Each structure stands twice: as structure tokens, then as C-alpha cells.
């Protein structure tokens, strides 16, 4: 993969999935159990491992899950008791939607190299839309062939819904139709 391609794929979800998948062993978690990391096939098991309330997508526009739900430690927060939960749909070569959520009172990654594209409301909470576009020979910010990140925070929980090669309206709908597990 070329350096240009690596720089272009700057989604926090890519880093979270790659690192988590490489180091996470399958884990089992029961309600009330200590926080754990791993890959999970159900939202209920992932929520038990994460130790905080999760939200799951209700609409993925036909994009298939690219793996399991990944729960890992939030390294940026500096505490082993904070978790980040990641899931992706589609492929990063064609179209994709992804969701990360953490309980670290902020993002668990550095994804701010982009252009601010506006402010929206997700479940009544102000969210900032960012795009990897409009500078350094990147596509125009009006193109759908760009990476978009929609970020918002509710209390100590931080959310990032992201997309590649999807219309803004789809990313906004993806985020606004999240439902509590």
C-alpha cells in the first residue's frame, strides 16, 4: 500500500480496528464482570466487556460487518479502565461506515487532520462534521469520495461515526438512528 494511500486512510476507526485486532484475544464477559478486551459477536457481550452503555447501528445501507465488535483499552486516555468499542461496515476500498464509542471523556485517537464541514445534532447533542478534503491535492469537500468523521460527546461517552465514499446524508442518518443496546 502506498504512503499516499496510508495517509489518506486516516480514520480513527482504522487504527483502532488494526491495533485491537492484532492484540485482542477472544474474550468472554458476563454482566458485572471486570472490564475486558476482545472481539465479540453480539452487542450485549461487547457492552458487558466495555462496562458502559453502547449504541448500535440500525441502518448500514446494506454494507456488511467487516469483522466482529472490537473492545480494547483506550490508550490515549491513559487509564486501563477506559474502553473503546469499534465496528466497521463495508470496505475501505469502496464504501464504508464505521462507529467508535468510548467512555474516556474524549476521543481515543488523533483524527483531527481535516476540514470542518459543519455542526449537526445527533439525538439532540451537537456534533462536529470533519472531512479529509480540500487541501494537499485531496478531493473537493463536496465530493462523496472523501472520508468523513462525525464526532460528538454525551457526558463521559465520546462517539465517532465515520464514512468513506458515502453521502453526508447517509453518515448523518447512520449516526442519528443509533439505538441503545
Segment roles from a protein language model:
Residues 155-181:
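Surface-exposed amphipathic alpha-helical segments
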Amino acid at each position: 500500500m502506498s504512503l499516499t494511500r496510508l495517509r489518506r486512510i486516516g480514520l480513527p476507526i482504522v487504527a483502532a480496528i488494526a491495533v485491537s485486532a492484532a492484540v485482542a484475544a477472544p474474550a468472554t464477559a458476563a454482566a458485572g464482570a471486570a472490564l475486558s478486551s476482545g472481539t465479540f459477536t453480539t452487542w450485549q457481550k461487547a457492552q458487558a466487556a466495555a462496562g458502559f452503555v453502547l449504541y448500535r447501528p440500525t441502518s448500514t445501507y446494506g454494507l456488511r460487518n467487516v469483522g466482529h465488535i472490537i473492545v480494547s483499552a483506550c490508550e490515549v486516555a491513559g487509564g486501563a479502565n477506559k474502553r473503546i468499542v469499534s465496528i466497521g461496515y463495508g470496505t475501505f476500498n469502496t464504501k464504508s461506515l464505521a462507529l467508535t464509542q468510548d467512555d474516556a471523556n474524549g476521543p481515543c485517537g488523533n483524527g483531527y487532520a481535516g476540514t470542518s464541514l459543519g455542526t449537526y445534532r445527533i439525538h439532540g447533542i451537537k456534533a462536529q462534521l470533519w472531512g479529509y478534503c480540500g487541501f494537499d491535492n485531496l478531493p473537493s469537500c463536496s465530493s462523496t469520495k472523501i472520508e468523513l468523521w462525525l464526532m460528538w460527546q454525551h457526558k463521559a461517552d465520546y462517539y465517532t461515526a465515520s464514512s468513506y465514499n458515502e453521502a453526508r446524508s447517509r453518515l448523518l442518518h447512520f449516526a442519528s438512528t443509533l439505538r441503545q443496546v
